[in-house]
Amino acid sequence: MSLPFNTGIFSVSRLNQTVRQLLEMEMGRIWLSAEISNFSHPSSGHWYFTLKDERAQVRAAMFRSSNQRVTFRPQNGQQVLVRAIITLYEPRGDYQLIVENMQPAGDGLLQQQFELLKQKLDAEGLFDQSHKKPLPSPAQQLGVITSTSGAALHDILNILKRRDPSLPIIIYPTSVQGAEAPLQIIRAIELANERRECDVLIVGRGGGSLEDLWSFNDERVARAIFHSDIPIVSAVGHETDVTIADFVADLRAPTPSAAAELVSRNQLELLRQIQSQQQRLEMAMDYFFAQKQHIFSLLSHRLQQQHPHLRLARQQNLLVNLRQRLTDSLQRYLKQNSLAYEKLQQRLWYAEPSQQIHHYSQQIQQQDFRLRQAIERQISRSREKFAVSCSRMEAVSPLATLARGYSISQTSDGKLLKQTKQVDVGDVLNTRLQDGWIESEVLKIKKERKKRSANLK
C-alpha cells in the first residue's frame, strides 16, 4: 500500500487522522489474548478497560451494542480472548482497541478453533445436504457408540424399552471425554461399518462444558462420521450444545433420548394404527359385501325378467301387434291406391290427346316459319355491314395510298424515314412501292428552305 504522504507539512490533527487510517486499513480485525485491568462500567453502558500482558498494555473500549452479547461479567485480572479493531483516538493521539467480541480465555480459544474447523469442513462440502443418508424406516438393528457408564446410554435404553423393546441393540463402548476419546470413537465407527450388524448408528454422550464435549469437535471424528456407510445420528449433550459432529452427521438429535425416539417405532402408536387400519378394513369389507349383495339382487331381478316363458309371452304379444298393424297398413294402402286410380281414370278421360297433338303441331310450324325468316334477315344485315367495313378498310389501307403514286422509305435499321436529318450521304434506303421494294443509296441531301414571312406593321 502506498502511504498517504506528500511533500506538504502535516498538522497534528491530520497526522493523527492519517495514522488512524493506516492502523484501520492495515491491521483490520484481530484476535488478542490478554489480561483485563482498570475495568470500568459507567452509566452509558460502555466498557472501558486495559488489556495487558507481562511486558505491555493497550487501552480498549467495548460499546454497549457489543457487550450486551457477552455471557459473563469481566473482572480485573481475568484472562480473555477478544476480537477487536485497532484504531486511534485522534484528540489525544492514543491508539486503542474497539472490542467486538469477548470470551474467557480457555473457552474462547476452543470456540475459535471450533469456528475455524467449522469453516474448513463447510468449505470442503462435508455439511452439504446432498451427502446426508436417509435413516431406515423402520430400523432393523440399532448401534450405539457411547460410554457404558454415562447417562446417555441409560436414557437411550429406557426410551427404546418403552417405545420399541423388540428392536435389537448393539453397544460399541467408547470413551467420550479425554485425549483417547476421539480415536476410540473413530475405531467404533469403523468397526460398525466392517461388521455390518446394524443399519443405523447413534453417536453421542450427555451434557457438559465445551471442553467436555471437545472429542466431538475433533476433525478426525468428523471425517469418520462423514465416510461412514451406515447412517449416523448425532446426539451430543443438551439441545443448546452444538458440535462439529452435529453438522457432519446424517441427522442431529438435540439429546440422546431424542435420538432414540427418532430411530425407533412407538409400539403403542403402531398398535393404535393397526387397530385403526383394522376398523377401516372391516368397514371396507362391510361396504364391499353390501355392494355385492345389491348387485346380486339386481342381477337376480334381471334374470327373472329374462326367463324364457316371459320372453316368449312378450314376443307373442309383439307378433300379434305387428300382424294387426300389417293388416291395417295393407287395407289403408289398397284404399288409397284405389282412390288414386279412379282419379287418374277421370283425368285421362277428360284429357283427350289427339286435339292437344294437333294444337301443338300448328304452334311448331308457326315457330319454324318465324325462325327461318329471322335468320335470313340477320344474315342479310351482316353481309351489308361486312361490305361497308371492307370499303372503309380499303380506303385507309397503306396499299391504296401506294396505288395513288406514293411510296414509303425506311433506313437500314428499319426506322420510317420522315426527315432528312435521319440519313447521311451514302446510307442505303429501302423504299416500298405498290408492287414491291427498291433499295437505293443517298447521293445528295437537299433541305427545303423555310420561308420567312415579313412582319406587317
UniProtKB/Swiss-Prot annotation:
Keywords: Cytoplasm, Exonuclease, Hydrolase, Nuclease. InterPro entries: Exonuc_VII_L, Exonuc_VII_lsu_C, OB-fold_nuc-bd_dom. It is an enzyme of class 3 (hydrolase). It is found in: Cytoplasm. Its main location: cytoplasm. GO terms for cellular component: cytoplasm; exodeoxyribonuclease VII complex. It catalyses: Exonucleolytic cleavage in either 5'- to 3'- or 3'- to 5'-direction to yield nucleoside 5'-phosphates. GO terms for biological process: DNA catabolic process. One of its GO terms (molecular function) is nucleic acid binding. The keyword Nuclease applies. Its EC number is 3.1.11.6. Belongs to the XseA family. Bidirectionally degrades single-stranded DNA into large acid-insoluble oligonucleotides, which are then degraded further into small acid-soluble oligonucleotides. Heterooligomer composed of large and small subunits. PANTHER family: EXODEOXYRIBONUCLEASE 7 LARGE SUBUNIT. This is Exodeoxyribonuclease 7 large subunit. The lineage of its organism: Bacteria, Pseudomonadati, Pseudomonadota, Gammaproteobacteria, Enterobacterales. The gene is xseA.
